């Protein structure tokens, strides 16, 4: 598609956008365009309000805040799990808001990795986020297994994408567990989770997914697909705040499985304060909690998730696709002559919520964008990631970002910066 009047198109799309009013729910910095919601979502006024309410409960109630106040702390994780559940396609009792991404991965692998006989290996991929690999290596070492031999990583054919056929071919009779991303963090490719789950189960293998780059951005059906487990962060697309508590999903057929890592908050609620040294685990995903919840880190999620309950994930996905479609059209029209390559899937069914623009000068281009008050992120060695977020970005934002990129390239403004990443990229 070619747009003869791209700015007019952006204005028209914004005028027709049913989600446009939600932009006012967020703290947007004047003169700045935020395109990094796939790394850290912005603060909403509702998230700020529920954090302040929880602080007020602490101030006014002290320890009674566990059972009283605006948002009682004792069952806050369960309340948030119920709000998370529609976003991942799980039942409320299959979801728990607890831990962090990597802690939850440790918990789930400690629970579901049961090497026996020939099945002693974990299958992952070569493009996943490094922390997942570190955790899998650690879990193997704890079992006395050498990661060099027992961690199998499916290679990418082109450095961008994974082929499900290659993953399925690697599901051999020595694999005990599979852990894969829902969406690749660099290229934004969506894996076919339903197909991979079906193929894994046909071979007697349990499978789990890292949903950090998909939860809050695309619909899921973890329960219906039969996914064994999943885990994700709540600070990217869900706007829960830096380092906020993560989430996990455990399919109901695994209820009653003793968690690999146990702690008192995994107890059945009515038994927790019996203080018995024999644990009575919760009978659902709540059993996978370990310690006391980080209440002030949970609190912003109350307001943040209320927005998703109002809007619905399908509406978020529809606008996200429209934004990224528009951005790809502009990149094709305006930036290919400068050496930019679109490194994400173009097919809407395979594309997550961000664009992956490849360029040899990516690090310097990101710094030049920041000098123009555009916030992207950089992934070595050559990727500029841009994530127009449905709840707070506009089509005109997308137009402005591409226009600024064109100016940067026309005037070679990037040359004043070093082509190396910053400490936090």
Curated annotation (Swiss-Prot):
Keywords: Hydrolase, Pyridine nucleotide biosynthesis, Pyridoxal phosphate. Pyridoxal 5'-phosphate binds at residues 101-102, 129-132, 210, 213, 235, 264, 292. Gene3D superfamilies: Aspartate Aminotransferase, domain 1 (3.90.1150.10), Type I PLP-dependent aspartate aminotransferase-like (Major domain) (3.40.640.10). One of its GO terms (cellular component) is cytoplasm. It catalyses: L-kynurenine + H2O = anthranilate + L-alanine + H(+); 3-hydroxy-L-kynurenine + H2O = 3-hydroxyanthranilate + L-alanine + H(+). It comes from the Bacteria. The modification N6-(pyridoxal phosphate)lysine is found at residue 236. Pfam families: KYNU_C (PF22580). Pathway: Amino-acid degradation; L-kynurenine degradation; L-alanine and anthranilate from L-kynurenine: step 1/1; Cofactor biosynthesis; NAD(+) biosynthesis; quinolinate from L-kynurenine: step 2/3. GO terms for molecular function: kynureninase activity; pyridoxal phosphate binding. GO terms for biological process: anthranilate metabolic process; L-kynurenine catabolic process; L-tryptophan catabolic process to kynurenine; NAD biosynthetic process; quinolinate biosynthetic process. Its EC number is 3.7.1.3. Its cofactor is pyridoxal 5'-phosphate. Catalyzes the cleavage of L-kynurenine (L-Kyn) and L-3-hydroxykynurenine (L-3OHKyn) into anthranilic acid (AA) and 3-hydroxyanthranilic acid (3-OHAA), respectively. Homodimer. HAMAP family: Kynureninase. Belongs to the kynureninase family. NCBIfam families: kynureninase (TIGR01814). This is Kynureninase. It comes from Exiguobacterium sibiricum (strain DSM 17290 / CCUG 55495 / CIP 109462 / JCM 13490 / 255-15).
């Amino acid at each position: 598609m070619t747009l003869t009047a791209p700015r007019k198109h952006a204005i028209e799309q914004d005028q027709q956008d049913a989600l446009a009013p939600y932009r006012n729910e967020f703290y947007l910095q004047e003169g700045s365009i935020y395109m990094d919601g796939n790394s850290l979502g912005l603060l909403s006024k509702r998230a700020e309000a529920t954090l302040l309410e929880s602080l007020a409960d602490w101030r006014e109630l002290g320890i009674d805040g566990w059972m009283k106040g605006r948002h009682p702390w004792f069952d806050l994780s369960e309340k948030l799990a119920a709000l998370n559940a529609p976003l991942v396609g799980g039942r409320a009792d299959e979801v728990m808001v607890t831990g962090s991404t990597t802690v939850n991965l440790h918990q789930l692998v400690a629970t579901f990795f049961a090497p026996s006989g020939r099945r002693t290996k974990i299958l992952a991929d070569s493009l996943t986020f490094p922390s997942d690999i570190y955790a899998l290596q650690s879990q193997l070492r704890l079992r006395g297994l050498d990661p060099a031999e027992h961690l199998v990583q499916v290679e990418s054919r082109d450095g961008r994408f994974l082929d499900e056929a290659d993953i399925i071919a690697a599901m051999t009779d020595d694999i005990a567990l599979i852990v894969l991303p829902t969406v690749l963090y660099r290229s934004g490719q969506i894996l076919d989770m339903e197909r991979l789950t079906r193929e894994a189960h046909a071979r007697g293998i349990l499978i789990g997914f890292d949903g950090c780059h998909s939860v809050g951005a695309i619909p899921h059906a973890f329960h219906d697909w039969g996914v064994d487990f999943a885990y994700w962060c709540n600070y990217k697309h869900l706007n829960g705040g830096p380092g906020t508590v993560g989430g996990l999903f455990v399919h109901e057929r695994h209820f009653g499985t003793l968690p690999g890592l146990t702690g008192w908050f995994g107890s059945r609620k009515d038994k927790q304060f019996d203080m018995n040294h024999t644990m009575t685990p919760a009978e659902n995903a709540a059993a996978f909690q370990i310690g006391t919840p980080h209440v002030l880190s949970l609190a912003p999620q109350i307001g943040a998730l209320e927005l998703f309950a109002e809007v619905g994930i399908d509406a978020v996905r529809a606008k996200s696709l429209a934004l990224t479609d528009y951005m790809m059209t502009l990149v094709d029209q305006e930036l290919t002559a400068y050496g930019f390559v679109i490194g994400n899937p173009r097919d809407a069914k395979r594309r997550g919520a961000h664009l992956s623009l490849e360029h040899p000068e990516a690090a310097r281009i990101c710094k030049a964008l920041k000098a123009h008050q555009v916030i992207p992120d950089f992934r070595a060695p050559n990727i500029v990631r841009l994530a127009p977020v449905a709840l707070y970005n506009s089509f005109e934002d997308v137009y402005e970002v591409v226009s600024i990129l064109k100016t940067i390239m026309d005037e070679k403004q990037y040359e004043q910066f070093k082509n190396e990443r910053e400490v936090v990229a």
